[in-house]
């Protein structure tokens, strides 16, 4: 193995381990907290978490083996199943992010009617459509034998081995990425930009009230005035940072892989095998970033996982104290009657 291959294999191992740990922690938070389970967006986050977990235990290990052995690491049947799952899970995770953005849009733009517009039943219907949409493409690909081991990405994924099917495969690939990546990106941009517009409007209203208050309080201490102005600046940047993170991570992780898949269809451009695996690793990195972007760094999830960790540490400290006490009692000499 070359130094590049060793480095790429190490990256895949790190992505796999972090994705497993982070998504399992999100799942534990969901099971531990009744408040999180009551929230409608929790269904979308739960679906996204399961997609990321399945990706970490199915596609990532085979990609690691493909990098190491430079060949198909498993039998055709296993590779077909993993390729089917990879296509389904990637599409489902993209559409789950789009569904989360729609939920935020309804909550911010229509706050008074949110609970009537986004109920558990509505979320379940959206989730059902997500699964049907995600399953349709791998079913078509599997029926036409367009799933297999792709050496460029060292992965079991969409792949056409027959030259006579090239035109149909090009059309299928274009439609697939348009109705998965591009559709999700359009929904993300539309909804989050609407959310940002409303957030900025509310910030301006709060800023006007703050400035009027500061003008009236002429004897206010300069340090208090400075803190108010600093909070005003932070408020303006907070929504922009969050929305930039949502859209930015989506583009950064998925766009290189999607563009590479589309460019690959042209026989004119040569794509390096190293770049193919790098683009695949970037797509895998979404399974690592999603738990932090959508869950673990939010206040409610942060409080929950801290409670879980403290509970585990407290229990382990009690057990260790009990063991130490038993050991001490055993070492004491017996009392003579």
PLM feature segments, named:
Residues 15-19, 47-60, 87, 126-138, ...:
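Alpha-helical transmembrane segments of multi-pass membrane proteins
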Residues 97-102, 106-109, 142-151, 176-215, ...:
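Class A (rhodopsin-like) GPCR signature focused on the TM5-ICL3 interface and adjacent 7TM helical core
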Residues 187-188, 248-253, 258-262, 275-326:
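Seventh transmembrane helix
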Residues 1-21, 337:
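Extracellular N-terminal segment of 7TM GPCRs
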Residues 201-241, 245, 299-337:
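Intrinsically disordered regulatory tails of 7TM GPCRs
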């Amino acid at each position: 193995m070359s130094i590049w291959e060793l480095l790429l294999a190490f990256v895949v191992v790190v992505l796999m381990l972090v994705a497993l740990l982070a998504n399992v922690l999100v799942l534990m938070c969901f099971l531990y907290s009744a408040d999180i389970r009551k929230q409608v967006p929790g269904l979308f986050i739960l679906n996204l978490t399961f997609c990321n977990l399945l990706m970490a235990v199915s596609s990532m290990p085979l990609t690691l083996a493909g990098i190491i052995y430079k060949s198909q690491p498993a039998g055709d049947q296993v590779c077909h199943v993993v390729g089917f799952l990879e296509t389904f899970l990637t599409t489902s995770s993209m559409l789950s992010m789009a569904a989360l953005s729609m939920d935020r849009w309804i909550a911010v733009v229509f706050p008074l009617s949110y609970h009537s517009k986004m109920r558990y039943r509505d979320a379940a219907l959206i989730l059902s459509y997500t699964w049907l949409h995600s399953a349709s493409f791998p079913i078509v690909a599997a029926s036409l034998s367009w799933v297999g081991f792709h050496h460029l990405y060292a992965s079991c994924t969409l792949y056409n081995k027959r030259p006579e099917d090239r035109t149909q495969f090009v059309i299928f690939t274009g439609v697939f990425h348009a109705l998965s990546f591009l559709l999700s990106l359009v929904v993300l941009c539309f909804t989050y930009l609407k959310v940002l517009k409303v957030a900025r409007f509310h910030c301006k209203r709060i800023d006007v009230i703050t400035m009027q208050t500061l003008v009236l309080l002429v004897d206010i201490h300069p340090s208090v005035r400075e803190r108010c102005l600093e909070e005003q600046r932070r408020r303006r940047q907070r929504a922009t940072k969050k929305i930039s993170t949502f859209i930015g991570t989506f583009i950064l992780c998925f766009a290189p892989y999607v563009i590479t898949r589309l460019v690959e269809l042209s026989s004119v451009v040569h794509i390096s095998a190293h770049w193919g695996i790098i683009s695949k690793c970037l797509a895998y990195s979404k399974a690592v970033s999603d738990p932090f972007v959508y869950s673990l760094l939010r206040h409610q999830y942060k409080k929950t996982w801290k409670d879980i960790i403290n509970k585990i540490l407290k229990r382990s400290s009690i057990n260790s104290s009990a063991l130490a006490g038993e050991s001490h009692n055993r070492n004491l000499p017996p009392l003579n009657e």
